[in-house]
C-alpha cells in the first residue's frame, strides 16, 4: 500500500474507536482477562504512570514466558509525531496506532509492548525469535508541555530493560539539539551513569540505533554519523561524572548503529525495501574485541550477548514491575538489587510450584506412615524409595531448569533451601521406613525363631537352637538391607543406613540373646520337672519303706531291708545322682544353644538351687503331719502286728502283748528325732549344701536371682543357718507328733487286748434265735423297702471294708477321743459361762477350795477307767 506523506496538523487515529485506549491494545481492567484483548499488544505503563499487572499474562499468551533468555527487547525513542509507531509497524509487523492525515496530536500514551509479527521466508533475512518491541511515548509533546518527569522515567525504564534503543530522527534534525533529541539522549546518558554507580562490577552496554528518516542521500550517511557522534561525545563530556570515571568515553557504555530510510510518502517502495533490509539486522550478532575497542558501529546483527540484561522471560514482568516501582517512587535504581529481588521472587514462586508437584508424589506416603504411627502399626511403604528418588530428581531438575537463569547467588541459596525442605521430608520418610523395617524385622525374627523351636518340640526331635538363630538372623538382615537399599536416595548425605544397620544387628543380638535365655529357662524348667519327677518317686519309696519291720509290704523284694538310721544318706545320694544326671542333660542341651560358659554356669547354679527346693518341698510333703503320723503308725503296726518273719500275729491272752507293744512303740519313737533333721548318719551333720550349691556366678544378674528361694547357710543375707535349713520338724511339732503317735499306738494296743479277750468269749446260740424272733417284723420291713434295703447293703459293704482294713479299732478309738475332747470343751465353756455371770461367781465363791474331777460312769455305776483296768487284767 502506498501512503502519501500526511500534512502537518492533519493526523488522527486510524484504528476503530471501540477498542479502548490507543485504539488496539488492552489496558488495565476487566478486558485484560480476555485473550482476544492481547492480539495487538499490551500497554505496559499508562499515561498515569500505572504499571499493568497483566503483562505476564500477555507474555504467556505470546509463548514468550518459557523462552528463558531467548528473547530480545527493543525500545524506540523520539519526538512526538515523528513516525516512531509507523517505523515499528513496518519493521516488526506490529499494529501500534499511528496518526491519520486529518489531525496532528499525541497517539502513543505511556509505554506499549508488542511481539514481533514479521515472518521472513528468506533464512538470511530472518529475524531473531521472540523480539519484544516497546513503543515509548514521544518527547516534546504539547500534552505534557514542560513536564519532563515521565520523559526521564520512561528513558530510565527503557535503558534498564532494553538491549537496543532505537532513536527515530529525521535527516533535517541532525545537528540540532532539541530536534535531534539530544536532550533526551543526555537524560539517557545520565541515567546510565546512575545505573553504573549502583553496579560497578557490571558495565551495562546498550546499542543506540539511530534510524534517520527521510534520508535523501545528498549528505552521506557517514557524515551524518560523524555529526551525531560528535554531538553525543560533547554531551557526554559535559556530564558530571563520578570519581574514577572522569576520563571515560561514551563508547565505554554504548555502541552505535546508523541506518537511513527513504521518505515513506515520496518513495514508498524504497522505504519498504529498506525497512525490510533494516529488519533483517535484528538478529543475533557477534563482534570481536578489536572492533569493540575501536568503537566501530554495528553493521550486522544487532543483538550482541553483552546487551542482554540476563533476565529470564518468565521473570521479566515481575522484574519490570520492580524497576518501574523504583523509578516512579523516585528511588535510586539499583539493578543488581532488583535482579536479586526478582531472583528471590521467581525462585520462591518456582519453589512453590515444584513443592506442589512434589507433594502430589510424596504426601500419600507421608499420610500412610503417619496413620500407621497413630494406629501403632508397623507400616512398610512399598515403592517408597522409587517414589522419593523420582520426586526429588524431578523437583530439583524442574527448579534448576526454571530458576538457574536468575541471579546465581540467589539461585544457589534457594536451591539449597529447596533441597533442604525436600530432604527434611524425605529423611523423615526414610527414617520412618527404616524404623518400621527395624521393628517389623525384630518382631518377625523373634516370631520365626519361636515358631521354629515350637515346630522342633512338636516333632519330638532334637533341634539345633543355635542354627535356627543363625539362619533367621541372616534372613532378617537380608530383608532389612533389601528394604533399606530400596529406600535410598542417591546424592543425599542422610541417605545412609550403616548406623541403623548396626543398631538393627545389635537389637537382633539382644533379641537372640533373650530368646536363648528364655529357651534356657524353658530348658531349666523341663530339667526341673524331670528332677521333680525322679525325686518324687525315689523319695516316696524311701519314706514308704521307712522302718518296715517285716518282710512283707514295705520291705524290699530282694536284698536286705534298708536301715532306718541311714534314710537321709540314701535320700541325699539319690538327690546328688539325680541332679548330676540333670546337669549333664542341661549342659549338653545348652551347648546346642550356643550358650556361653557363663550362661551355662548360671544355668547349672540355678538348677542346683531349684533342685534343692524341689527336694525340700518333697520332704516337707512326705513329712506333713498327717502323712508322717500315718507312716509312724504303719511302722509301729509293722513291728507290733507282724513278727520278724512278716507273719501276722494272732493275739492270745497268753501273749506278751505289753512287751511287744513297748518295744514296737519305742522303736518307732526313735524315728521322730531322726526325721526331724536332715542329718547324714556317717557324721551326724547336715549335708555339705553350701559347698554343693557353690558360690553365686559373677555373671548372674538380678533377674537370675529374683525367683530363687533363699537357702540357709548358702545365702548369708537370708540370716538363716544351715542347721535351720535342714531342720524339718521343730521341737513343738516333735512333741505334738509324739503325743499323737502315742495315742494312736495306744488305740492299736487296746484293740489288740480286746482281740485277745474277744477270742475267748462267745455269743450264746439262743441269742441269735431270740434276735430273729423279736426283730422279724423289722427285718421283713427292711427287706421289703428298697430304700432301707439299699441303706443296709451300703452299711454292710462299709462294715466289711472297715473290717478287712482292720480299722474298727482306730475308728472306735478316734470316736472315744473325740467324745472326750468334746466333753472337755463343754466343761470349759460351762466354766467360762459361770465366771461371766454374777450368779455363777457367787456359787464359785461359796464352794470349797477343793476340786473334784468328774468321772465317766458306765450303766452299772462303775468308772470306765476301773473297767479298763479289769480288762487289762
UniProtKB/Swiss-Prot annotation:
Keywords: Coiled coil, Endoplasmic reticulum, GTP-binding, Hydrolase, Membrane, Nucleotide-binding, Transmembrane, Transmembrane helix. Gene3D superfamilies: P-loop containing nucleotide triphosphate hydrolases. Its EC number is 3.6.5.-. It is an enzyme of class 3 (hydrolase). Residues 691-716, 839-873 are annotated as: Disordered. The gene is sey1. This is Protein sey1. GO terms for molecular function: GTP binding; GTPase activity. It is a multi-pass membrane protein. Pfam families: RHD3_GTPase, Sey1_3HB. Residues 784-786 are lumenal. One of its GO terms (cellular component) is endoplasmic reticulum membrane. Residues 703-716 have a biased composition (Acidic residues). InterPro entries: G_GB1_RHD3_dom, P-loop_NTPase, RHD3/Sey1, Sey1/RHD3-like_3HB. GO terms for biological process: endoplasmic reticulum membrane fusion. Residues 462-519, 812-839 form a coiled coil. It is found in: Endoplasmic reticulum membrane. The chain crosses the membrane at residues 763-783, 787-807. Belongs to the TRAFAC class dynamin-like GTPase superfamily. GB1/RHD3 GTPase family. RHD3 subfamily. Residues 68-320 form the GB1/RHD3-type G domain. Cooperates with the reticulon proteins and tubule-shaping DP1 family proteins to generate and maintain the structure of the tubular endoplasmic reticulum network. Has GTPase activity, which is required for its function in ER organization. The keyword ATP-binding does not apply.
Amino acid at each position: 500500500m502506498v501512503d502519501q506523506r500526511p500534512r502537518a496538523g492533519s493526523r488522527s487515529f486510524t484504528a476503530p474507536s471501540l477498542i479502548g485506549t490507543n485504539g488496539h491494545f488492552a489496558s488495565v481492567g476487566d478486558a485484560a482477562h480476555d485473550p482476544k484483548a492481547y492480539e495487538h499488544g499490551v500497554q505496559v505503563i499508562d499515561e498515569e504512570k500505572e504499571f499493568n499487572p497483566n503483562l505476564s499474562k500477555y507474555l504467556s499468551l505470546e509463548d514468550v514466558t518459557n523462552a528463558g533468555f531467548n528473547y530480545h527487547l527493543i525500545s524506540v525513542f523520539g519526538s512526538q509525531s515523528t513516525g516512531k509507531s509507523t517505523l515499528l509497524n513496518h519493521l516488526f509487523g506490529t499494529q501500534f496506532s499511528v496518526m491519520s492525515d486529518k489531525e496532528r496530536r499525541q497517539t502513543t500514551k505511556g509505554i506499549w509492548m508488542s511481539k514481533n509479527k514479521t515472518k521472513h521466508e528468506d533464512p538470511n533475512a530472518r529475524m531473531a525469535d521472540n523480539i519484544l518491541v516497546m513503543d515509548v511515548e514521544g518527547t516534546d509533546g504539547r500534552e505534557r508541555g514542560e513536564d519532563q518527569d515521565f520523559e526521564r522515567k520512561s528513558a530510565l525504564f527503557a535503558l534498564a530493560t532494553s538491549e537496543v534503543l532505537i532513536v527515530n530522527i529525521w535527516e533535517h534534525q541532525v545537528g540540532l539539539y532539541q530536534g535531534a533529541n539530544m536532550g533526551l539522549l543526555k537524560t539517557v546518558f545520565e541515567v546510565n551513569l546512575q545505573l553504573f554507580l549502583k553496579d560497578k562490577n557490571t558495565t551495562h552496554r546498550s546499542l543506540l540505533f539511530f534510524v534517520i528518516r527521510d534520508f535523501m542521500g545528498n549528505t552521506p550517511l557517514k557524515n551524518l554519523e560523524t555529526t551525531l557522534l560528535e554531538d553525543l561525545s560533547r554531551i557526554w563530556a559535559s556530564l558530571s561524572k563520578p570519581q574514577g570515571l572522569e576520563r571515560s568515553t561514551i563508547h565505554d557504555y554504548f555502541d552505535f548503529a546508523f541506518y537511513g530510510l527513504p521518505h515513506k510518502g515520496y518513495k514508498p517502495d524504497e522505504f519498504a525495501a529498506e525497512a525490510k533490509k533494516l529488519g533483517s539486522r535484528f538478529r543475533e550478532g557477534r563482534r570481536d574485541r578489536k572492533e569493540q575497542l575501536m568503537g566501530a558501529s554495528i553493521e550486522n546483527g544487532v543483538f550482541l550477548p553483552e546487551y542482554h540484561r540476563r533476565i529470564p522471560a518468565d521473570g521479566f514482568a515481575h522484574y519490570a514491575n520492580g524497576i518501574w516501582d523504583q523509578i516512579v517512587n523516585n528511588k535510586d535504581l539499583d539493578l543488581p538489587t532488583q535482579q536479586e529481588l526478582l531472583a528471590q521472587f521467581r525462585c520462591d514462586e518456582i519453589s512453590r510450584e515444584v513443592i506442589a508437584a512434589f507433594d502430589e508424589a510424596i504426601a500419600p506416603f507421608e499420610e500412610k506412615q503417619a496413620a500407621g504411627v497413630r494406629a501403632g502399626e508397623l507400616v512398610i511403604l512399598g515403592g517408597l524409595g522409587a517414589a522419593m528418588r523420582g520426586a526429588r530428581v524431578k523437583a530439583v531438575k524442574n527448579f534448576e531448569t526454571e530458576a538457574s537463569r536468575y541471579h546465581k547467588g540467589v539461585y544457589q541459596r534457594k536451591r539449597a533451601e529447596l533441597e533442604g525442605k525436600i530432604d527434611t521430608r524425605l529423611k523423615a520418610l526414610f527414617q520412618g521406613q527404616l524404623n518400621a523395617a527395624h521393628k517389623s524385622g525384630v518382631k518377625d525374627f523373634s516370631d520365626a525363631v519361636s515358631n521354629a523351636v515350637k515346630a522342633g518340640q512338636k516333632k519330638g526331635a532334637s533341634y539345633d537352637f543355635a542354627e535356627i538363630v543363625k539362619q533367621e538372623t541372616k534372613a532378617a538382615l537380608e530383608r532389612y538391607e533389601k528394604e533399606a537399599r530400596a529406600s535410598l536416595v542417591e546424592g543425599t548425605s542422610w541417605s545412609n543406613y550403616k548406623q541403623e544397620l548396626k543398631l538393627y544387628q545389635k537389637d537382633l543380638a539382644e533379641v537372640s540373646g533373650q530368646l536363648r535365655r528364655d529357651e534356657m529357662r524353658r530348658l531349666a524348667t523341663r530339667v526341673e520337672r524331670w528332677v521333680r519327677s525322679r525325686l518324687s518317686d525315689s523319695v516316696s519309696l524311701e519314706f514308704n519303706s521307712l522302718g518296715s519291720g517285716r518282710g512283707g509290704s514295705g520291705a524290699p523284694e530282694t536284698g536286705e531291708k534298708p536301715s532306718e538310721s541311714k534314710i537321709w544318706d540314701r535320700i541325699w545320694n539319690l538327690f546328688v545322682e539325680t541332679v548330676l544326671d540333670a546337669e549333664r542333660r542341661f549342659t549338653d542341651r545348652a551347648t546346642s544353644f550356643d550358650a556361653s560358659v557363663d550362661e551355662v554356669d548360671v544355668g547349672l547354679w540355678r538348677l542346683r538351687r531349684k533342685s534343692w527346693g524341689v527336694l525340700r518341698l518333697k520332704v516337707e510333703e512326705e513329712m506333713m503331719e498327717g502323712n508322717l503320723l500315718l507312716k509312724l503308725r504303719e511302722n509301729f503296726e509293722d513291728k507290733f502286728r507282724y513278727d520278724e518273719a512278716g507273719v501276722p500275729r494272732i493275739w492270745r491272752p497268753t501273749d506278751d502283748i505289753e512287751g511287744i507293744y513297748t518295744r514296737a512303740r519305742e522303736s518307732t519313737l526313735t524315728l521322730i528325732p531322726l526325721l526331724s533333721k536332715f542329718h547324714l548318719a556317717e557324721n551326724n551333720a547336715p549335708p555339705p549344701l553350701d559347698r554343693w550349691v557353690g558360690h553365686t556366678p559373677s555373671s548372674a544378674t538380678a533377674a537370675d536371682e529374683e525367683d530363687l528361694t533363699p537357702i540357709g547357710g548358702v545365702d548369708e543375707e537370708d540370716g538363716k543357718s544351715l542347721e535351720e535349713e535342714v531342720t524339718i520338724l521343730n521341737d513343738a511339732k516333735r512333741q505334738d507328733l509324739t503325743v499323737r503317735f502315742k495315742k494312736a499306738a495306744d488305740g492299736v494296743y487296746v484293740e489288740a487286748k480286746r482281740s485277745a479277750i474277744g477270742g475267748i468269749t462267745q455269743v450264746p446260740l439262743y441269742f441269735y434265735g431270740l434276735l430273729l424272733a423279736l426283730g422279724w417284723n423289722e427285718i421283713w420291713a427292711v427287706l421289703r423297702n428298697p430304700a432301707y434295703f439299699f441303706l443296709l447293703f451300703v452299711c454292710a459293704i462299709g462294715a466289711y471294708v472297715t473290717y478287712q482294713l482292720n480299722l474298727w479299732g482306730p475308728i472306735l478309738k478316734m470316736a472315744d477321743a473325740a467324745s472326750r475332747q468334746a466333753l472337755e470343751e463343754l466343761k470349759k465353756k460351762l466354766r467360762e459361762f459361770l465366771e461371766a455371770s454374777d450368779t455363777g461367781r457367787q456359787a464359785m465363791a461359796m464352794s470349797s477350795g477343793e476340786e473334784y474331777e468328774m468321772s465317766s460312769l458306765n450303766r452299772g455305776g462303775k468308772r470306765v477307767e476301773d473297767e479298763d483296768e479289769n480288762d487289762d487284767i
